[in-house]
């Protein structure tokens, strides 16, 4: 009986040792991102590690490096989304790293559905081509909800949808579906993106 008790205690201690680093890791990972948009205001995004852990971490890493500071929303479409994160500003650029696409078509279950306020990764035809470009859905249109399973949603705007709406209203490309804003002076600029602690 004594031997069994000792073994149980040892097993319990081992389990606690294994779980502690995992718990600490979850507590320390960045969960909220603040984006200050020049002339518009602040957007606060809550990252979703449960549905898109690789994508959320990649985004947080880029934010911590200051990657997004000074970049613009180069593609803005009414009743669809605003897209940014391209250092070239052409829709063709990205960071030096590409990540696995965390969406159903690529074999990954992602239960964060595209709807107004959801933040998702842009990509090319290659499922694993997402890098730094992201978009924020600005409506619940069929164009938006139809993205489920095809793109990796990884966060949601919890404050600042009025900012997203203002950007949409003032810089939309009404007749340029799929294009980019050619007049760079009209683009909304990310003044600063940073990791924050957030309390309601």
Which residues fall in each region the model found?
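Sec-dependent N-terminal signal peptides of Gram-positive bacterial secreted proteins and lipoproteins
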Residues: 4-26
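Cyclophilin-like peptidyl-prolyl cis-trans isomerases
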Residues: 18-200
């Amino acid at each position: 009986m004594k031997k069994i008790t000792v073994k149980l205690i040892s097993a319990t201690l081992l389990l606690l040792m294994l779980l502690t680093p995992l718990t600490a890791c979850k507590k320390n990972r960045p969960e909220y991102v603040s984006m200050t948009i020049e002339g518009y205001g602040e957007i606060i995004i809550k990252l979703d590690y449960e549905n898109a852990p690789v994508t959320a971490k990649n985004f947080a890493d880029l934010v911590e490096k200051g990657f997004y500071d000074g970049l613009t929303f180069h593609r803005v479409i009414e009743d669809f989304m605003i897209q940014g994160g391209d250092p070239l500003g052409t829709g063709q650029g990205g960071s030096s790293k590409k990540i696995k696409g965390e969406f159903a078509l690529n074999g990954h279950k992602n239960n964060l559905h595209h709807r107004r306020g959801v933040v998702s990764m842009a990509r090319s035809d290659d499922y694993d081509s997402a890098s730094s470009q992201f978009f924020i859905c600005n409506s619940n249109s069929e164009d938006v909800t139809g993205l489920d399973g095809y793109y990796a949603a990884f966060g949601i705007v919890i404050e600042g949808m009025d900012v997203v709406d203002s950007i949409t209203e003032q810089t939309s490309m009404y007749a340029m579906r799929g294009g980019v804003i050619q007049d760079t002076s009209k683009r909304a600029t990310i003044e600063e993106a940073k990791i924050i602690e957030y309390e309601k």
